[in-house]
């Protein structure tokens, strides 16, 4: 089937694109210890902490039966509608820092932008927001008006006026 073949070939291309930072990092001839290596570890660690904290906060919030049908606004979810995706993106942001000494290092600075486009427009957020609007309706619309979609920012007023 040509459609299935095309689908799987497209996935293979995306896997190759998303693997480039790790490959370039491994090709870096410098020994570990440059300031960019430590910056990469700090950014990656911050992303991991953010993603794990957001997932844990959401899981704890969902366990409370009183929250059924409502939107989580606790913890990081007060500042971003998708703090877990933001944390994941921070982890992707770390890879180009780690690969700066490799031949592809500077080109890989574009990689986090590609990941950001995927999260904001193609894979993560659009699908999640559609499902949230279907399941939580007006509560989620108010949350959308008050809360940044991706980057953690102070909340705006939920009043639509």
Model-derived regions: residue spans:
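Interfacial transmembrane-helix boundary/kink motif in multi-pass membrane proteins
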Residues: 1-10, 35-38
